[in-house]
Amino acid sequence: MTTVTRFAPSPTGYIHVGNLRTALMNWAIARKSGGTFILRLDDTDRERSKQEYSDGIMEDLEWLGLTWDRLERQSDRLDRYAEAADELRRAGRFYECFESPTELDLKRKKLLNMGKPPVYDRAALKLSDEERARLRAERGGYWRFLLDQERIEWTDGILGPISIDAASVSDPVLIRADGQVLYTFASSVDDIDMGVTFIVRGGDHVTNTATQIQIMQALGGTPPSFAHHSLLTGAQGEALSKRLGTLSLRDLRARGVEPMALLSLMARLGSSQPVELFRTHEELLAGFDVSTFGAAPTKFDAEDLFPLTRHYVQGLPFEAVRGRIAALGVPDDLAEPFWRVAKDNIGVLEDLGGWWTLFSEGAEPQIDPEDEDFIRQAMTLLPPPPYGPESWAQFTAAVKEATGRKGKGLFMPLRKALTGQAHGPDMSEVMPLLQKVRAKG
């Protein structure tokens, strides 16, 4: 049987690190097994779903290289959901309710005050036809699925054996009074119709999975296998949801995070395997195993992405960055030497711009007060650009002979005067790249 997985985001916002984890796991399972990966936009919320978010989700996945085999939109399938609702009505598994949100909240609070679980009391099932007709005329009805009050069991791909007593769960609302089809229902119908065989999602969906298993069975479908991964927290264990605004993929991308650095962290975070940098999707897939993930909350720190990004960037061949370097205005004959000098001194590729500015426009000299006279004298011994591979050795030899300085007292002030930095690349490689020197004699 062909493995079919899906990633089903709601286009009510951009992808963040939390749902990226879900996307990556489902993509990896499909790709590793030679199966099908579906991108399904769960866009039945007409008020909050926006095209810009749909476009953004696809752009972010393409940036990561998480390509999909099929694109589906729930907004194209509303007629199918109406058909499925009729099937459930005919089977006696769908019933109309009329409580207002306020009335439901009062029922919930009353049960909690009595120390009971806040499970819907199925009062709507006790209504007579006359009462139902009167309420329907007064207010719009919403629809619940009638659960079989028995244990729902499955073997979870991460959590292991799961058993939930359906009697402890409210009959789920599947269609709102305004006619909006809710996620629990639309997703169940889609997963059956699209032949989904394996679903990975967050641990906050476990109870939802139990109800969806019954919905799928009531529609004559075979539920897929499920795996529920742990939820991410902040670095200190705090709820991540409050910070997701700064952890969208596009925000991380703007900070220079590389796709493979992000995927490498997400492919191992929360698993028993150590985090390591994968340079290709093929390497990542070879080491991916959903069964290695655990149930405990998983700490995420965005700063962990930057050592991985630095490692990835510094290992790139020149051909991979040729276009970016050319866009900076680096002459062709200096492009490869520039990359060789700059690559070990950057954290993200955007740092290249700063290095080329230093070489092309000259650095603001950093001169300690006690070195001012020394630098003035030294600069009189420096010829104008261009410089060659021997220029640094020739320059420092001339300065040493003229001033008597040597060692760190010679080299450090000159480095700071020419580059504005106390540390950096080998000066013998820097000199041929210098187009301008701002320190004066």
From Swiss-Prot:
GO cellular component assignments: cytoplasm
UniProt family annotation: Belongs to the class-I aminoacyl-tRNA synthetase family. Glutamate--tRNA ligase type 1 subfamily.
Assembly behavior: Monomer.
Enzyme class: ligase
Keyword set includes Cytoplasm: yes
Chemical reaction(s) catalysed: tRNA(Glu) + L-glutamate + ATP = L-glutamyl-tRNA(Glu) + AMP + diphosphate
Lineage summary: Bacteria, Pseudomonadati, Pseudomonadota, Alphaproteobacteria, Rhodobacterales
Statement: the UniProt record of this protein carries the keyword GTP-binding: no
One Pfam family this sequence matches: tRNA-synt_1c
Function statement: Catalyzes the attachment of glutamate to tRNA(Glu) in a two-step reaction: glutamate is first activated by ATP to form Glu-AMP and then transferred to the acceptor end of tRNA(Glu).
Gene: gltX2
Assigned EC number: 6.1.1.17
GO MF annotations, alphabetized: ATP binding; glutamate-tRNA ligase activity; tRNA binding
UniProt name for this protein: Glutamate--tRNA ligase 2
Extent of motif 'HIGH' region: 9-19
Subcellular location: Cytoplasm
Organism: Cereibacter sphaeroides (strain ATCC 17029 / ATH 2.4.9) (Rhodobacter sphaeroides)
Motif 'KMSKS' region mapped to chain: 239-243
